[in-house]
């Protein structure tokens, strides 16, 4: 019989979990692609990009519809700048975020953020919502060889928190993020978007919620 693991830290994803930014990333991506003359009506030809780093998404577009002019890195920077601008305009904090972070603190957990988005965006978003002081460590996959579903960003966040990945619970909204956290051997809580709630792949998670407002101490600690 296995011994229940002791949970010492909670690590949150950002896009789609803390802020409703996935539609904003999509809008930023399509705005920039359209400006390059790319046929954005072919968006459905791309594989599932939810939770992927934006440079990986840009590479997928380029492989199907190469453009002339700006480099892929320049295009990535344009999409990021546009996404940040849209977040600042709309301030899309999702329900239950403050309460979820507070619950983690009440349970004595360290709190981290592990995201595919750039580090300066993580800082900006947390500061925007007065949450920066609640997070003990931030980890971004922007400069890593591989982003989610690779586990490295979760392993990096655990290292920054000074804890073993086995003592972490990860909170995610995407399949790619869930796979990353499970590959890091963490307890997994998923809060899928309504349209993804019935995705059978989420059976891999330890807990599935429809909103962070439902989060309990038992969900966190097991």
UniProtKB/Swiss-Prot annotation:
It catalyses: sugar phosphate + H2O = sugar + phosphate; 2-deoxy-D-glucose 6-phosphate + H2O = 2-deoxy-D-glucose + phosphate; D-mannitol 1-phosphate + H2O = D-mannitol + phosphate; D-sorbitol 6-phosphate + H2O = D-sorbitol + phosphate. It comes from the Bacteria. Substrate binds at residues 13-15, 115-116, 148. The active site is at residues 13, 15. InterPro entries: Beta-PGM-like, HAD-like_sf, HAD-SF_hydro_IA, HAD_sf, PGP-like_dom2. Requires the presence of a divalent metal cation for activity. Can use zinc, manganese, cobalt or magnesium. Keywords: Carbohydrate metabolism, Cobalt, Hydrolase, Magnesium, Manganese, Metal-binding, Zinc. Its cofactor is Mg(2+); Mn(2+); Co(2+); Zn(2+). One of its GO terms (molecular function) is metal ion binding. It is an enzyme of class 3 (hydrolase). Its EC number is 3.1.3.68, 3.1.3.22, 3.1.3.50, 3.1.3.23. Sugar-phosphate phosphohydrolase that catalyzes the dephosphorylation of D-mannitol 1-phosphate and D-sorbitol 6-phosphate. Also catalyzes the dephosphorylation of 2-deoxyglucose 6-phosphate (2dGlu6P); this is a biologically important activity in vivo since it contributes to the elimination of this toxic compound and plays an important role in the resistance of E.coli to 2-deoxyglucose. NCBIfam families: HAD-SF-IA-v3, PRK10826.1. This is Hexitol phosphatase B. The gene is hxpB.
